[in-house]
């Protein structure tokens, strides 16, 4: 039996929830399920916006047939060619022989790649700003390349002032009968999953998201209809603001996220001691065991927190495997502008700190707070002062107001250590400053042009 929800008088949600899928895209755990959203506009013409993943095809087809109520389907608008939204295209053409497909030029190429040449005669490529009048409604197409594939576009309904936003503004989690974000406590129940969705699916493409947000500013939007998660009809500024923050890589919390990877518990102990000292100083701390918690959750909180600490055992003269994979994941998502500290452990030749720094230091705007803390097998009582100093340094850095860490013109400068390459960012370089990595004094720093 059908299971649809009305978005408004002319739009109907005809998508489906899936709770059987363990890993979205084969990578990201979705313990609370996920929705595959598809929307039908019934006007003088009928328009379907995207299809769904083949995992929920039966529910989708029943929903679509019910919403059409015997009418023909005139158009399918393809916003995004990923198979979780386009898997049913070929069957739609078989079921509705009059239907025409509208998509971007690059999506048209991808349709051929996924389904062969048979659909070519049904496809019209549309460009930025082109419109389709369906009767009462005028649809305007908006290019959104690399959010998060190159062929992506969105559709703005000028009549109902709603934006069908493809994969932007989505969320992990099944809808559970709800459709609108205002039907539940979104902050409490879904904000973390919305952040995890953004950071892992779209997070790499911050500049492209910023470009879409600038386009959105020119539109009078009263409703957001994404391809995953809830429809937004209230508090749009709140959620658009979150996307603005995330896509600028601005942290939401001034605090410390600590991720560690430990073989026998000694590296974990060092991380716990540091967390305790930081908490005693009033610093907000979040901890993860990289060998237990899937990377997508840690990546999400790396976007959330201003300061990051990574602690790892040396393993086969490298970084312990789960930490190495986590850091590669963070680097792949191009998280920017973070302050970090490292703890390394090794019984005879600890090198994990150097190896971790080699992965993190090239990232845009990343800078080390302090030289790596080295543990030889286990943290010793005579290292208490080192832990305390590291905690003091991190706490002081967290307490800085980033808005005031500028020169008299409100600008930040980058000062590079000529000895080791460490980068200090701020308004001016203090005269008594010493490089946290090599100990070189301020005279060994040069300002980047």
Indicate where each model-derived feature is located.
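FMN-binding flavodoxin-like domain, especially the glycine-rich phosphate-binding loop
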Residues: 175, 186-224, 228-231, 273-288, ...
């Amino acid at each position: 039996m059908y299971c649809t929800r009305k978005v408004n008088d002319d739009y109907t949600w005809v998508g489906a929830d899936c709770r059987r899928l363990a890993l979205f895209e084969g990578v990201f755990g979705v313990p609370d399920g996920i929705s595959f959203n598809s929307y039908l506009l019934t006007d003088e013409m009928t328009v379907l916006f995207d299809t769904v993943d083949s995992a929920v095809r039966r529910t989708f087809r029943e929903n679509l047939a019910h919403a059409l109520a015997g009418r023909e389907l005139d158009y399918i608008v393809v916003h995004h060619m990923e198979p979780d939204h386009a898997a049913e295209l070929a069957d739609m053409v078989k079921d509705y022989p009059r239907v025409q497909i509208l998509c971007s030029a690059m999506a048209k190429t991808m349709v051929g790649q996924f389904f062969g040449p048979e659909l070519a005669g049904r496809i019209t490529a549309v460009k930025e700003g082109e419109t389709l009048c369906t009767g009462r409604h005028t649809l305007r197409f908006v290019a959104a390349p690399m959010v998060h594939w190159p062929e992506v576009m969105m559709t703005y309904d000028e009549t109902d002032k709603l934006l069908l936003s493809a994969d932007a503004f989505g969320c992990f989690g099944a809808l559970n009968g709800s459709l609108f974000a205002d039907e539940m406590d979104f902050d409490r129940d879904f904000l973390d999953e919305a952040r995890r969705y953004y950071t892992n699916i779209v997070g790499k493409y911050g500049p492209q998201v910023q470009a879409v947000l600038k386009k959105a500013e020119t539109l009078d939007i009263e409703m957001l209809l994404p391809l995953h998660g809830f429809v937004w009809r209230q508090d749009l500024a709140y959620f658009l603001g979150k996307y603005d923050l995330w896509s600028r890589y601005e942290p939401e919390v001034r605090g410390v996220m600590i991720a560690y990877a430990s073989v026998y518990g000694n590296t974990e102990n060092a991380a716990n001691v540091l967390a305790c000292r930081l908490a005693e100083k009033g610093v907000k701390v979040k901890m993860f065991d990289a060998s237990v918690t899937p990377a997508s959750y840690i990546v999400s909180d790396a976007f959330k927190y201003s300061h990051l600490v990574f602690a790892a055992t040396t393993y086969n003269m490298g970084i312990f495997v789960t930490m190495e994979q986590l850091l590669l994941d963070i680097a792949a998502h191009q998280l920017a502008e973070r302050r970090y500290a490292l703890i390394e452990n090794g019984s005879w030749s600890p090198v994990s700190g150097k190896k971790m720094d080699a992965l993190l230091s090239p990232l845009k705007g990343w800078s080390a707070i302090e030289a790596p803390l080295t543990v030889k097998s286990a943290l010793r009582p005579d290292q208490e002062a080192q832990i305390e100093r590291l905690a003091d340094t991190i706490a002081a850095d967290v307490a800085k107001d980033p808005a005031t860490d500028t020169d008299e013109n409100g600008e930040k400068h980058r000062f590079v250590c000529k000895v080791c390459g460490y980068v200090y960012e701020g308004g001016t370089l203090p005269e008594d400053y010493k490089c946290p990595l090599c100990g070189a004094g301020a005279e060994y720093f040069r300002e980047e042009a």
